[in-house]
């Protein structure tokens, strides 16, 4: 048996749902999708869901992860085994841990390939900081996986599809995290997975202010702006959602222009599937040049304005 009887899908990020649904279609005979509202339910059915389970009734101060209990109960009630697919976002991984505990299931994060052999999931993902690919065969009846961006192509919606909709009512968990306050985050929403051209900056750009030079290049050529993990996580110069690498975005653009990025394996795992890689770095021995199809050795602060003028013509 090379498919599961059922797969359960949930995405806290709407843009990640189409690829998860495409993976679900390849891995199971019946697709169940948990959603948070009617609009997401309609999208899920158009993407191939046979059954949509609308999570309802959560108090505003409670977290989405607190639905884990009723989600696990629903999964158990509809089969003695199954596959759960989640995005490898922060919330996806937290929810995976909670579901794994409640389903007594193995959990595998950041999966880059998934197959089914004899009714069991076989998962591949990066190990040792991206230096190797590990393969795991999950033996538990339920398997909970968080999927790396780009693992599956996006499913295409079909408005003629039909499915059944059910409601899953909120049940307060015995131990819960209560949200006491929220703080709006300034973020320009962008779907980097679909970008044809990407300009990505590393700490070699020098300062947060210098990122404006990369933004000007993006405007000139119609590219989207991304970054390395240190720029987002260490320096806090850009949003977490924009960093490329093993534990976040895995991109496949036509052009990936790396500016001031050294080229460590953890980053290149997320960019190496690009059709063309162009690197700008002042260190001629930077590892990025081993991956680049084209490269310029020099100061990005001086090169970017000249490149912007040349490409804007």
Curated annotation (Swiss-Prot):
Signal peptide positions on this chain: none
Domain of life of the source: Bacteria
Family, as annotated: Belongs to the ETF alpha-subunit/FixB family.
SUPFAM superfamilies attached to this UniProt entry: Adenine nucleotide alpha hydrolases-like, DHS-like NAD/FAD-binding domain
Biological role stated in the UniProt entry: Required for anaerobic carnitine reduction. May bring reductant to CaiA.
Keyword Zinc among record annotations: no
A Gene Ontology biological process term: fatty acid beta-oxidation using acyl-CoA dehydrogenase
Protein's recorded name: Protein FixB
The protein's annotated pathway: Amine and polyamine metabolism; carnitine metabolism
Source organism phylogeny: Bacteria, Pseudomonadati, Pseudomonadota, Gammaproteobacteria, Enterobacterales
Pfam families in the cross-refs: ETF, ETF_alpha
Organism: Escherichia coli O1:K1 / APEC
Keywords associated with the record: Electron transport, FAD, Flavoprotein, Transport
Subunit structure: Heterodimer of FixA and FixB.
Binding site for FAD: 255-283
GO MF entries: electron transfer activity; flavin adenine dinucleotide binding
């Amino acid at each position: 048996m090379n498919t599961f009887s059922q797969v359960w899908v949930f995405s806290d990020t709407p843009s990640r749902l189409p690829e998860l649904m495409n993976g679900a279609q390849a891995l199971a005979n019946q697709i169940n999708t948990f959603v948070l509202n009617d609009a997401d339910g309609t999208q899920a059915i158009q993407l191939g869901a046979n059954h949509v389970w609308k999570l309802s009734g959560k108090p505003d101060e409670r977290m989405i992860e607190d639905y884990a209990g009723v989600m696990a109960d629903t999964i158990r009630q509809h089969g003695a085994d199954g596959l759960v697919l989640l995005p490898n976002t922060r919330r996806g991984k937290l929810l995976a841990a909670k579901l794994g505990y409640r389903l007594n299931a193995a959990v595998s994060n950041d999966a880059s390939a998934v197959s089914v052999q004899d009714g069991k999931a076989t998962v591949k993902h990066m190990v040792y900081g991206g230096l190797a690919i590990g393969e795991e065969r999950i033996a538990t009846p339920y398997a909970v996986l968080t999927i790396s961006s780009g693992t599956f192509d996006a499913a295409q919606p079909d408005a003629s599809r039909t499915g059944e909709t059910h409601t899953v009512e909120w049940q307060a968990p015995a131990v819960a995290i209560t949200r006491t306050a929220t703080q709006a985050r300034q973020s320009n929403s962008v779907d980097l997975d679909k970008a044809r051209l990407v300009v990505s900056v590393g700490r070699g750009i020098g300062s947060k202010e210098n990122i404006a030079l990369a933004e000007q290049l993006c405007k000139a050529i119609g590219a989207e702006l991304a970054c390395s993990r240190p720029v987002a996580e260490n320096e806090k110069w850009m949003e977490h959602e924009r960093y490329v690498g093993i534990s976040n975005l895995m991109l496949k653009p036509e052009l990936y222009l790396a500016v001031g990025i050294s080229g460590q394996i953890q980053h290149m795992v997320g960019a190496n599937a690009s059709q063309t890689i162009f690197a700008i770095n002042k260190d001629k021995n930077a590892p990025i040049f081993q991956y680049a199809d084209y490269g310029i050795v020099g100061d990005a602060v001086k090169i970017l304005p000249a490149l912007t003028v040349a490409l804007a013509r």
